[in-house]
Amino acid sequence: MTQDDQPDYRIPQGGGVPWRDMGMEETHRPPERDIEITAIETMAIAGNFTWGIVKVETDADVYGLGETFRAEAALDMAGRMEVDLEGENPLDTDRIRELLEQRYTGTGRIGQAAFTAIETACYDIKGKLFDVPVYELLGGKYRDEIKI
């Protein structure tokens, strides 16, 4: 591969996330393996403090759930991210992370909290589709029980 064949990675001025054209063909999954995000729903659950739940829905009639803290602001941010994620494949979590990092750099903890809930929901979708617990997707079980 020559230097001219390399993908275009650029560091934004002042640092930040390397830029890559997410429209490049190499960043897409083959159509026969496609599943798409169709909607993102958010809900707040009151308790000692407010928890946020994010539901990522797909065209395969499978949905995933993720949770977040800082519910009001993070849920608002997750709702705004829906526009960027509709049509994306929830199995491509690295691609989704890069896409959201590019578009939402500078949103701080709120942006990270929103993304983490979406990412968790995508892993939940993977677990359901592959019929394995999410901990298996993340490297396996570490322990069988914990002290409470």
Segments (PLM) and residue ranges:
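Structured loop/turn residues at beta-strand edges in well-structured enzyme cores
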Residues: 35, 116, 144
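A generic local secondary-structure boundary/capping motif
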Residues: 43, 137-138
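Subtilisin-like serine protease catalytic core
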Residues: 130, 140-141
